[in-house]
């Protein structure tokens, strides 16, 4: 188990969260992204994720370093699952701790946006009537676009 990794087995939230806990941290924000059944009115049967693992893990660690630079004192753990995932399975876990909650919340949101922008992970959405590969890389994180639908 590593602080930044790609896995094929179900993600155990508490084990990864514990990477971020120490006596200096007053807040831990944990985000788990799950496979949802409905997307834009289309029913999903399951998802299949693929990644270029060596590069993906390097990019996850890069995001952790970026967070540490933007919010000093934070500790980040990021784990993404690949392979077939069923409805409600955890696809991604991001845990960020900091001395105070505001930085932990902001850094956690930053992490998920950066994953979508720079980490070489692709998902295949399998629906009742077809399937389609989706890429996540969207370019450089832009604080001004935060909160806008993609």
UniProtKB/Swiss-Prot annotation:
InterPro entries per record: MoaE_sf, Mopterin_biosynth_MoaE
Gene3D superfamilies xref list? Molybdopterin biosynthesis MoaE subunit
Which pathway? Answer: Cofactor biosynthesis; molybdopterin biosynthesis
Which species is the source of this protein? Staphylococcus epidermidis (strain ATCC 35984 / DSM 28319 / BCRC 17069 / CCUG 31568 / BM 3577 / RP62A)
Biological function: Converts molybdopterin precursor Z into molybdopterin. This requires the incorporation of two sulfur atoms into precursor Z to generate a dithiolene group. The sulfur is provided by MoaD.
Q: What is its EC number?
A: 2.8.1.12
| Name listed for the protein in its UniProt record | Molybdopterin synthase catalytic subunit
Entry GO MF terms:
molybdopterin synthase activity
Q: Enzyme class, one word?
A: transferase
Q: Name one GO biological process term.
A: Mo-molybdopterin cofactor biosynthetic process
Where substrate is bound, by residue? 34-36, 44, 100-101, 116, 123-125
Q: Which PANTHER family match?
A: MOLYBDOPTERIN SYNTHASE RELATED (PTHR23404)
Quaternary assembly: Heterotetramer of 2 MoaD subunits and 2 MoaE subunits. Also stable as homodimer. The enzyme changes between these two forms during catalysis.
Q: Which reaction does it catalyse?
A: 2 [molybdopterin-synthase sulfur-carrier protein]-C-terminal-Gly-aminoethanethioate + cyclic pyranopterin phosphate + H2O = molybdopterin + 2 [molybdopterin-synthase sulfur-carrier protein]-C-terminal Gly-Gly + 2 H(+)
What CDD domains does the entry give? MoaE (cd00756)
Assigned keywords, A-Z: Molybdenum cofactor biosynthesis, Transferase
Q: Which family does it belong to?
A: Belongs to the MoaE family.
């Amino acid at each position: 188990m590593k602080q930044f990794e790609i896995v094929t087995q179900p993600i155990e939230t508490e084990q990864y969260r514990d990477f971020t806990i120490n006596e200096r941290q007053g807040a831990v924000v944990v985000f788990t992204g799950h496979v949802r059944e409905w997307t834009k009115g289309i029913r999903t049967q399951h998802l299949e994720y693929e990644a270029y693992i060596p590069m993906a893990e390097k990019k996850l660690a890069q995001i952790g370093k970026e967070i540490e630079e933007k919010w000093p004192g934070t500790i980040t753990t990021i784990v993404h699952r690949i392979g077939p995932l069923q409805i409600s399975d955890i696809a991604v876990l991001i845990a960020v701790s900091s001395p105070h909650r505001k930085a932990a919340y902001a850094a956690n949101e930053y992490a998920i946006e950066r994953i979508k922008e720079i980490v070489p992970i692709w998902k295949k959405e399998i629906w009742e009537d077809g399937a389609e590969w989706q890429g996540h890389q969207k370019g450089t994180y832009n604080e001004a676009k935060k909160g806008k639908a993609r």
